[in-house]
Amino acid sequence: MGITYRNRYSKAWSGIIATGSPHADFQNLGKNNANDVFCKLVPFWQLELYFGKVLGRTPLQQADKGGFYPEVYEYARNKDYTGMTHGEIQLDFVYACSKISGMNLLDFFTKWGFLTPVDKELDDYGKKQLTVTQDMIDALKQKVNALGGTRLDVALEYISDNTYELYKTKPAIIKGENATHAPKTFTVGSGDNAVTYNGETITIKNWTNVVTYEVKDETGKFILICSGENAPSSVDTFTIPVRWKDGFRLSAVSVTGERIDIPMN
């Protein structure tokens, strides 16, 4: 994933959640905001991690071979999408997941940009127009809220293959040492697309039960979101694309979404 992103999850979080972008409009470091379809797949896999691996709603564990995604597929198989736009279909997926899970998933899908207005032509196995307006979003929210689903008590947007076991027990964060930072200059891209960043390498030691680290500037704007798993090592390191400044905030995020500030030396 390069010098900044520890893995695909970190890249997806930083390119969609941190930027507040529509799900269809992934933003990468550098000049080349390429359409990274693998980053866009992350929230779909997170639903399987949580409902399947954490809650056991998967054909691998259910005696009837049912589960969350089998029911979503059955919903889609029986749904008449005739005349619906791609934006309407995207929002209907949010509704279907909330209805089938019995949970209100608006917060999850909002953070992943499914409920962010967009009007864009996508080129993914053919060119199609994706349009989602604020009026469409407002109507969808009313529809989902009317289901009366349970609100999530976990930071579902931050579950990953390396942390899903924590979502079964929801342990509190165990604090470690103060973080440190050191200057790091790096280049993203090559040729005319090359961009050089004067950044910082952040080092965090002996913090456990952390699902992600969030770095924000003095205004509260995201700089980077990085995966927090540190097994088998007790040390986490990652690089931000700017120099560390007074007023910046480094937070450790728990399974339940609790944020604990990490002092920086």
Regions found by a protein language model. Name each.
Residues 5-7:
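Short, glycine/acidic-rich hinge or "gate" loops at secondary-structure transitions
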